[in-house]
Design a protein with these regions (language model features):
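Hydrophobic alpha-helical context, especially transmembrane and signal-peptide helices
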Residues: 19-21, 26, 157, 204
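N-terminal compositionally biased, intrinsically disordered segments and leader/signal-like regions
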Residues: 8-10, 21, 25, 73, ...
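N-terminal secretory signal peptides that target proteins for export/translocation
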Residues: 1-18
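Bacterial N-terminal signal peptides
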Residues: 23-35
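Extracellular-facing segments of soluble proteins and assemblies that are Gly/Ser/Thr-biased and enriched
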Residues: 123-193
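Boundary at the C-terminal end of the N-terminal hydrophobic targeting segment
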Residues: 37-42
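Acidic, serine/threonine-rich low-complexity disordered tracts
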Residues: 43-127, 132-136, 180-280
Length: 280
């Protein structure tokens, strides 16, 4: 990548506007992968029945930030004491309806290191590779994420359960900003301390809802999710976006061992994310 290129402030501002939801998606990737594939006490993730090569989960979200996200598991390694390794490939398309234009398309490849030796499970992805394309700029770089807490609702969700503890997700990312027209780096985007906090979760009684497998008795799990990106270094500019707060409901179906729907309320708008395909 060419070094010493001048940073054009107008371009950086344009990149910031266009990618305003991108860092939050990065910081929350583990939330989607963990919460929608099912969060739990130590021991459970590495022995989950759906954890094998070829498992695929596809999500479809509506609202002002429509998205299609597909997770694929590969190269599972259980030959590790008190843990396992998981290859995770993510392909996503998302965008802001108000901006129009080409959606943001991202490809992520992570190697998840799962440690189940402690009281809570810990999952770490170091320098996961990311490539993102949008109409005005591409991002090429890495993201690292550390997650501690629950990862399988099934293991901690007894029939009489009414509450579950919260979780935290810490991320950092480092990207070159590339001009699609010129094919060269025009800037750099760095965040050292992005964080997602999930409050204590309230569990409701089972309700029958439509799912990809037909009507199922599923339990609503409600909580507040706060995403903080910290200080972003965008070229020569320093940006500190305000934290974003969302009220989330996960619909977990015990018979399927998966969250089939997630409802996210933010700024008076509700986005519904459904599992539309599950192969395991």
């Amino acid at each position: 990548v060419p070094q010493g290129l001048p940073i054009r402030t107008p371009m950086c501002r344009q990149v910031h506007r266009r990618f305003s939801l991108w860092p939050a998606l990065l910081a929350g990737f583990a939330l989607a992968a963990g919460g929608l594939a099912a969060p739990a006490q130590a021991a459970g993730l590495c022995t989950a029945p759906w954890l094998h090569d070829g498992t695929r989960l596809r999500l479809d979200g509506n609202g002002k930030t429509p998205m299609i996200v597909e997770f694929t598991l590969h190269d599972i390694n259980r030959d590790i004491v008190d843990g396992c390794e998981i290859g995770l490939h993510i392909h996503a398309k998302s965008g802001l309806v108000a901006l129009g234009g080409r959606p943001i398309e991202t490809v992520q490849d992570h190697r998840l290191m799962v440690d189940e030796a402690g009281v809570v499970t810990r999952v770490v992805s170091t320098n996961g590779r990311v490539f993102a394309q949008s109409e005005h700029a591409d991002l090429v770089g890495t993201v690292s994420t550390a997650i501690s807490g629950m990862f399988l609702y099934g293991a901690g969700l007894a029939p009489e359960a009414e509450m579950l503890p919260g979780d935290s997700y810490d991320s950092s990312f480092d990207f070159d900003v590339v001009s699609p027209r010129l094919g060269i780096a025009i800037g750099h985007l760095h965040a050292a301390h992005a964080r997602v906090d999930v409050s204590e979760r309230e569990i409701g009684p089972p309700q029958t809802i439509p799912t990809l497998a037909g009507p199922q008795a599923c339990r609503p799990i409600r909580y507040t999710r706060t995403a903080t990106l910290g200080v972003l270094q965008l070229g020569n500019e320093t940006i500190e976006p305000a934290p974003t707060v969302a009220h989330v409901t996960d619909w977990y179906c015990p018979a399927l061992s998966v969250v089939v729907r997630q409802e996210v309320e933010q700024h008076g708008e509700t986005q519904v994310i459904n599992v539309v395909d599950l192969q395991r």
